[in-house]
Curated annotation (Swiss-Prot):
It comes from the Bacteria. Binds to the 23S rRNA. InterPro entries: Ribosomal_uL15, Ribosomal_uL15/eL18, Ribosomal_uL15/eL18_sf, Ribosomal_uL15_bac-type, Ribosomal_uL15_CS. Pfam families: Ribosomal_L27A (PF00828). This is Large ribosomal subunit protein uL15. PROSITE patterns: RIBOSOMAL_L15. Residues 1-44 are annotated as: Disordered. The keyword rRNA-binding applies.
Amino acid sequence: MADNDAIKVHDLRPAPGAKTAKTRVGRGEASKGKTAGRGTKGTKARYQVRAGFEGGQLPLQMRLPKLRGFKNPFRTEYQVVNLDKLSAHFPEGGEVTVDALVSKGLVRRGQPVKVLGTGEITAAVQVKANAFSASAVEKIQAAGGSTETL
């Protein structure tokens, strides 16, 4: 192939009709002039109504009920651990602390831990946690273990 037959980057151009200029409305009296494609008169010809405007109909945000009650800013969110998880991860029993639970991947660090009573436990465990449910304390003590609230 000869050098003069090769396509050069500066010779490339878009296909005819691929690039069209943005339509400028309201300039003169031709196609998109005068009313600029908005028809004649009325609200839509003069301005846009705000988003959510429904005419004379009661707006959606006023039709829906108000949010009632309140959120307690001092509520403590516990990470929960059930007894079936404790018996699976500590089958031989022993001391169960928050650090031990973190190292086994049962809870994350930085949030208080609450032990709940779902499941059964047979090994005697000494559990140290931030909170316990009554059923969890009952089952742990029945298995020969003890609980300590931090």
